[in-house]
């Protein structure tokens, strides 16, 4: 991309080795945890702009979250010490859209991104914001995709833009 215009789009190698399908510029790939660096950068930009305080309780910016036992700071979320669980540690939540949806696994369990169980960002946020802490904040390191998802919601709330646009 140069000056906002796509100047090169290509793929190299194979999209499917078994079938010999070449990779081209139209294939979509899951970024997984690579996106965390963009979320963290956006959070730090907001702090640099004076719009958030990294040592403040996240509920100052996302008041609809549960009232946690202990203060969950933005810094604790960035450093994976917030006490928040991860996708596979959420007990049987469901949504009105799909009352049978049981979010227990992001890979191969009942909750699978991108298929018929797909939740919109808003629907997923409605589930995640009701998840209690697994443990008190700042007690133990535990990798948490949920914390980073909530940080992306914080960026959108505070900036008034999508994470991508911000």
Which residues are covered by each model-predicted region?
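Short hydrophobic alpha-helical segments used for membrane anchoring or interfacial signaling
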Residues: 1-3
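Well-ordered alpha-helical scaffold segments within catalytic/enzyme domains
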Residues: 152-157
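Active-site-proximal loop and beta-strand segments within enzyme catalytic domains
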Residues: 8, 12-144, 159-161
């Amino acid at each position: 991309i140069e000056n906002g215009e796509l100047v090169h789009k290509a793929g190299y190698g194979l999209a499917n080795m078994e079938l010999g399908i070449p990779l081209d510029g139209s294939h979509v790939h899951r970024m997984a945890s690579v996106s965390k660096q963009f979320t963290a950068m956006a959070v730090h930009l907001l702090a640099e702009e004076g719009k958030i305080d990294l040592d403040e309780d996240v509920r100052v910016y996302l008041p609809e979250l549960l009232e946690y036992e202990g203060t969950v700071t933005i810094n604790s979320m960035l450093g994976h010490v917030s006490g928040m669980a991860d996708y596979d540690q959420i007990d049987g939540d469901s949504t009105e859209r799909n009352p049978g949806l049981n979010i227990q696994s992001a890979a191969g369990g009942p909750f699978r991104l991108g298929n018929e169980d797909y939740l919109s960002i808003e629907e997923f946020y409605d589930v995640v914001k009701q998840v209690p802490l697994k443990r008190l904040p700042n007690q133990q390191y535990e990798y948490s995709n949920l914390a980073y998802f909530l940080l992306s919601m914080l960026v959108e709330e505070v900036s008034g833009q999508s994470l991508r646009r911000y």
